């Protein structure tokens, strides 16, 4: 049987869906449960779980520290997750993938520009409708209109430019390391999932990952 390897994104440990699936009440409890399963899978089945260093590792540790996780959990992360920097200079990516990424990025930029233009028109229209000289002054109108428009703009702009694509170095490192190791990608991220498929990588949803490892362990225990 081929050795099983997994490459973890931060969301493999921190995602709220993971906590819910494990019945945990907080990130500290769910992280400890996941790390305990990972450690058993490593010792009993030689299943290795990797994390890109230092991008994703620092992101994960920073999140756990901000959530007040106890030091024992950090130690488990350091012990059972294999930290490795992707060999960015040696990993070969088909040029078609790069072409698709640039094309996708260009389309998102254009969409973001259209959203920006629409937001300007909406702001001007709202200001015109709301402004009543006898009732409101200029600052009141601007504050009322801009706060609403800016909030709507942020949501639409974020979705247009970041939803379903790679928008950070840690995201890319997860895919590069998984390709280098021929490992399955573990995440709850639409962009990582989409580009993992394009690269021909195995993908495991973060909320399913602990139960997949547990299934391996249960089968091993029946031998």
UniProtKB/Swiss-Prot annotation:
Gene Ontology molecular function: ribonuclease P activity
Enzyme class at the top of the EC tree: hydrolase
Protein family: Belongs to the HARP family.
Annotated NCBIfam families: PRK04358.1-1, PRK04358.1-4, RNA_lig_partner
Keyword Nuclease: yes
Stated name of the protein: RNA-free ribonuclease P
Record field: catalytic activity: Endonucleolytic cleavage of RNA, removing 5'-extranucleotides from tRNA precursor
Source organism of the structure: Methanococcus vannielii (strain ATCC 35089 / DSM 1224 / JCM 13029 / OCM 148 / SB)
Biological processes, Gene Ontology terms: tRNA 5'-leader removal
Entry's EC annotation: 3.1.26.5
Keywords: Endonuclease, Hydrolase, Nuclease, tRNA processing
Task performed by this protein: RNA-free RNase P that catalyzes the removal of the 5'-leader sequence from pre-tRNA to produce the mature 5'-terminus.
Lineage of origin: Archaea, Methanobacteriati, Methanobacteriota, Methanomada group, Methanococci
